Amino acid sequence: MSDYKKTLSMPNTNFEMKANLSVKETKIQENWVLEKIEKKILAKNKSNTPFIIADGPPYANGDLHTGHALNKILKDIILRFKASVGFYTKYIPGWDTHGLPIEQEMAKRGLNKNANQTITEKRKNCKNFAIENVYKQRDQFRRLGILSEMDEIYVTCDLDYVIRQIKIFNKMLSKGLIYQDLKPVYWSWSSQTALADAEIIYQDVESDSIYVSLEILDKNEFVSKGDKVIIWTTTPWTLPSNLAIAANPKVTYCRVQVENSVYVISKNLVEKLAETLEWTNYEILSEFSGKKLENLPYKSPISDKKCKIIVDGYVSDSDGTGLVHNAPGFGHEDYLACKKYNIKPYCPIDNLGKFTGEVNDKELAGLFYKDANPIIIERLAKKKLLLKASKFTHSAAHDWRTKKPVIYRATKQWFVNIDKISKEIVAALNKVKSIDNTIIKKIKEMVLNRQEWCISRQRIWGVPICIIYDKDYNPILDPKLLNNIVDILNDEGINAWYNEDAKYFLTDSYNTSKKYIKETDIMDVWFDSGTSYSVLQADKLGYPADLYFEGKDQFRGWFNSSLITSVAAFKKSPYKELLTHGFVLDENGNKMSKSLGNIIDPLQVCKEYGADVLRLWVASVDFSKDVSISKDIIAQNAELYRRIRNTLFRFILGNLNGFNLKKLRGAKYSEADLYVLSCLSNDIKTIKACYDKYDFKQIVKIVSKNVADLSSWYFDYIKDPLYCEKEDNEQRIAIQATLYQLLDSYLRILAPIIPHTCEEAYEFFDKKDKQKSVHLEGFTNFKIDSKYKVDFKKWEEFFDLKDKVYSEIEKTRNEKVINSKGQAHITIHSKSLPFDEQTLERYLGVAKVEFKVKEKDGTTIKVKNSKYARCERCWNYYPTNLIANELCERCKKVIGNKKI
């Protein structure tokens, strides 16, 4: 038997089967930088419409996690696609570099503990650490295959950025949208600073629950002297600061006789309280509105001071007693209610959560607030004021960084007045679009639920609030002075604020012999990142940005702060479109944690599988929800990647070897070729629409299905003409032209998702007008010529028939009747066939197709061994009389007089 292998046109390409991405990707990335691919793309699209994604800055602390990878890769896919269709897509990544975590890291390292250190020296240590982490994370992001070279970045501690931020602060100040006030704010004793809503998390805690009776000291026509109001509280430690009791003016209250005492409570809660306080025998004496209690005096439970009952609509009669203990120094609603009665906040708790001497109680002074609870409860019991004490579990506010409980505490802070611009915020949001309508609704609710935003922090590592006070601690809001401060800081650096005396910043109009004091607080880090749109303004990239795209936690964070500052300063939303993604969880829906051992390190995935496999996972998930990742899930995506690489790219590259590009135009396509090209044309239209609406998972589904479909039929069918026909055979040339269009299109389709592999395959692709990079090609514009008409119904019938035939062939093979489908003789009983028998023989890859008309509906298929002889060159089966000297007629002609 002769060896005919040398006479076949077998696939040949240097595009390797083994990806070896961990090595190849870094080289490809180096080449992108060397060839300035990003800059060439930007130059190519410079005069076109911009599409700008504003980068929400990750925090410059630690290594990247899968959440970072998900976010950056999603943005990169969008930008690569937008660039491929002609948009100008300059991208400036940024980092959030201020804040408590870095101060805490310095404390861990012992760098900022020296009592002799200046604030400037401490800030320098913080900055060095932050910048070190910026560069580390930048290199890690580059490993993910981000198109941006990241040579132009923004960092929130850079002087230019800080100056722009202070100018925005001053602009809001000049509009009366920033003010200072003494009022309760979330206070973290563990971090020793005020916190904003976005910095609060909720965790279950066990608290004291007490019911306390307080004696009324006077009478009116509805209440008698000596009657007792009942209050319920879960914060006994605030009772020394009690300054009022609040009733609802519209709620009905009653006097209830219980043994020798008369209590005043909400009528609606009598039965509930009777059960809670175990009143076995009680009588309602009278009823009246809460308004009738206003200004009645009572004795405060711990201080014994004479206080008064006030009325306010916030008081509820759905739980408690319908009467609320008010400590305006420790509660926001208390503060607002008491303010109407000119009752000022009283707050005898220090930064560490300990009672100060102001409490005027030797036993409590210096005590941590929680430790005061048992002492206060014991005192109430001794005074016979305690009606009931118990424990209960509830959700309470905690510091998001330290995970310790926080309290409301009245301190002098700086606030943004959100309520004042609420209408402008709504108007701005109404112009913002989103693929998910609930996103706009959610951000609107999040912002409008806040009347104010506390933006001052009692720390050192941040942007200083550059305000100077007079000797009486009144802030001087003179625009000329504020501008002078900005000019000095711009010239000398931000640390001049800490190095110089307050008088150094004064203009000539001020009397320097007087006393002036500098503000020591810094701005909330959300104000830092929330003014990052200034980067776009400074770079003239277009403001508002086309897209803000971050995790769903940013409704309370970056989306929120950016919107507030932008509307306040510039009367517009900073984004035209808003998009969110979910959190990354393990395959069981659990959060990543070291204790569970379920952490997937994105950099380790890049090392083990390659960034393109990680990127394929990102593209395959429904990012609008929480997404799952695990070793098994990554392995599944690696298998899909392998099919794309080898079944699609490598197979086609191998079979385009020697293809004459000049033959593209005159190719004479078969019905099969035209069907494949028509499907490609339709899919390109669908895929482009998916890219436009960020539906990457659907793109992956389409590509995955097409790879499976092509490999299961078309690629199998075309092997015979590709391998066995002469190189100039018309059918073979048409098939190669079809493969050319498939490869050219899929390289461009998949370039945003698996950019390294598409770049590698493109290197081996001999194509017309070849560029330096596949990413300079632009998105595929292939569209099948309208002169070609494809009967898709006929093809549906064919594929339905194919599945039935192959199913019967498999049964016959299992029964050992045939060894391969090439031996099969197929008899089809049906009303009609989609193609004639000879065409079906080629398309199905069988020896013989015999058609027998069947009057009734349905198709019956029978398979038997054709008993034909095999051609030893092409391995097709023919009647014995058509095989001579091992070869079929076609193969004899192809070989001709060649010596084997």
Curated annotation (Swiss-Prot):
<comment type="function">
    <text>Catalyzes the attachment of isoleucine to tRNA(Ile). As IleRS can inadvertently accommodate and process structurally similar amino acids such as valine, to avoid such errors it has two additional distinct tRNA(Ile)-dependent editing activities. One activity is designated as 'pretransfer' editing and involves the hydrolysis of activated Val-AMP. The other activity is designated 'posttransfer' editing and involves deacylation of mischarged Val-tRNA(Ile).</text>
</comment>
<dbReference type="Pfam" id="PF08264">
    <property type="entry name" value="Anticodon_1"/>
</dbReference>
<keyword id="KW-0547">Nucleotide-binding</keyword>
<dbReference type="GO" id="GO:0006428">
    <property type="term" value="P:isoleucyl-tRNA aminoacylation"/>
</dbReference>
<dbReference type="GO" id="GO:0008270">
    <property type="term" value="F:zinc ion binding"/>
</dbReference>
<keyword id="KW-0436">Ligase</keyword>
<feature type="binding site">
    <location>
        <position position="891"/>
    </location>
    <ligand>
        <name>Zn(2+)</name>
    </ligand>
</feature>
<feature type="binding site">
    <location>
        <position position="874"/>
    </location>
    <ligand>
        <name>Zn(2+)</name>
    </ligand>
</feature>
<dbReference type="GO" id="GO:0005524">
    <property type="term" value="F:ATP binding"/>
</dbReference>
<dbReference type="InterPro" id="IPR050081">
    <property type="entry name" value="Ile-tRNA_ligase"/>
</dbReference>
<feature type="short sequence motif" description="'KMSKS' region">
    <location>
        <begin position="591"/>
        <end position="595"/>
    </location>
</feature>
<dbReference type="GO" id="GO:0005829">
    <property type="term" value="C:cytosol"/>
</dbReference>
<keyword id="KW-0648">Protein biosynthesis</keyword>
<comment type="subunit">
    <text>Monomer.</text>
</comment>
<keyword id="KW-0030">Aminoacyl-tRNA synthetase</keyword>
<dbReference type="InterPro" id="IPR009008">
    <property type="entry name" value="Val/Leu/Ile-tRNA-synth_edit"/>
</dbReference>
<dbReference type="InterPro" id="IPR009080">
    <property type="entry name" value="tRNAsynth_Ia_anticodon-bd"/>
</dbReference>
<keyword id="KW-0963">Cytoplasm</keyword>
<feature type="binding site">
    <location>
        <position position="594"/>
    </location>
    <ligand>
        <name>ATP</name>
    </ligand>
</feature>
<feature type="binding site">
    <location>
        <position position="871"/>
    </location>
    <ligand>
        <name>Zn(2+)</name>
    </ligand>
</feature>
<protein>
    <recommendedName>
        <fullName>Isoleucine--tRNA ligase</fullName>
        <ecNumber>6.1.1.5</ecNumber>
    </recommendedName>
</protein>
<feature type="binding site">
    <location>
        <position position="550"/>
    </location>
    <ligand>
        <name>L-isoleucyl-5'-AMP</name>
    </ligand>
</feature>
<dbReference type="InterPro" id="IPR014729">
    <property type="entry name" value="Rossmann-like_a/b/a_fold"/>
</dbReference>
<dbReference type="InterPro" id="IPR023585">
    <property type="entry name" value="Ile-tRNA-ligase_type1"/>
</dbReference>
<keyword id="KW-0479">Metal-binding</keyword>
<dbReference type="InterPro" id="IPR002301">
    <property type="entry name" value="Ile-tRNA-ligase"/>
</dbReference>
<dbReference type="GO" id="GO:0002161">
    <property type="term" value="F:aminoacyl-tRNA deacylase activity"/>
</dbReference>
<dbReference type="InterPro" id="IPR033708">
    <property type="entry name" value="Anticodon_Ile_BEm"/>
</dbReference>
<comment type="similarity">
    <text>Belongs to the class-I aminoacyl-tRNA synthetase family. IleS type 1 subfamily.</text>
</comment>
<feature type="short sequence motif" description="'HIGH' region">
    <location>
        <begin position="58"/>
        <end position="68"/>
    </location>
</feature>
<dbReference type="InterPro" id="IPR002300">
    <property type="entry name" value="aa-tRNA-synth_Ia"/>
</dbReference>
<dbReference type="GO" id="GO:0000049">
    <property type="term" value="F:tRNA binding"/>
</dbReference>
<feature type="binding site">
    <location>
        <position position="888"/>
    </location>
    <ligand>
        <name>Zn(2+)</name>
    </ligand>
</feature>
<dbReference type="InterPro" id="IPR013155">
    <property type="entry name" value="M/V/L/I-tRNA-synth_anticd-bd"/>
</dbReference>
<keyword id="KW-0862">Zinc</keyword>
<dbReference type="Pfam" id="PF00133">
    <property type="entry name" value="tRNA-synt_1"/>
</dbReference>
<dbReference type="GO" id="GO:0004822">
    <property type="term" value="F:isoleucine-tRNA ligase activity"/>
</dbReference>
<keyword id="KW-0067">ATP-binding</keyword>
